[in-house]
Swiss-Prot record:
Top-level taxon of the source organism: Eukaryota
Expression across tissues: Expressed in roots and leaves.
Quaternary structure note: Homodimer.
Compartments, record wording: Nucleus
Keyword annotations of the record: DNA-binding, Nucleus, Transcription, Transcription regulation
Every bHLH domain range: 115-164
Name of the protein described by the UniProt record: Transcription factor bHLH19
Amino acid sequence: MDEDFFLPDFSLVDIDFDFNIYEENNLSPDESLSNSRRADQSSKFDHQMHFECLREKPKAAVKPMMKINNKQQLISFDFSSNVISSPAAEEIIMDKLVGRGTKRKTCSHGTRSPVLAKEHVLAERKRREKLSEKFIALSALLPGLKKADKVTILDDAISRMKQLQEQLRTLKEEKEATRQMESMILVKKSKVFFDEEPNLSCSPSVHIEFDQALPEIEAKISQNDILIRILCEKSKGCMINILNTIENFQLRIENSIVLPFGDSTLDITVLAQMDKDFSMSILKDLVRNLRLAMV
């Protein structure tokens, strides 16, 4: 009987033999060191490839910002599950994007600093207070104001201004008409009596007798000047009475001239300045008083 008859059947596949261990045990020291270096490099390469894969992992796409109906909305072009779509996350992303961008201009709406906003409020408050004071002052100048609102005040002020302009135009026309009247003569001439007495022995003679109807007064007006000419009988204190009477009518005497005319008559000329309130009725009163002063 054969000795191998009782041995079990097996193949080379059933032999589990670690050739690497065998080779490492049978390699020389130099070859073992070289193999260990290659193993370390292979391990480092595996780690590096793993890190590069992590770096090349797709990131969440940055959502571009678009302006629709004056509101900022985020539109995503990436449909991966890594993108956060909650409103809070969108606000955080927007804040970060704005912070990374350029500095905002100070003139844009909603970016005014608190100090500038406070100064603007104070300036606007002062402007409104000043405007209210002006309206109050204007309402005080308007007679018969029924309401104190701004619209009524402006309407009444416009009407009042038109009325005053019309009055001014009328006064200018009246003043121009008065200036065109170069002179006004108020004269009361002396009465002259002719008494003819026939005389048979000689030729007829003419007897002229002057009544006591003097003085003769003439007044002329030119713009603001008044020229008064008086022809009167010579009497004591006559000139003083005339000048005092003229000054009593608020006339400023600029010049006066007295010339004798004959033995008993004076020719008096007075130049005076009159006020704007001087009227024709006052001039008549002046002539009347001058006549009474020389009686």
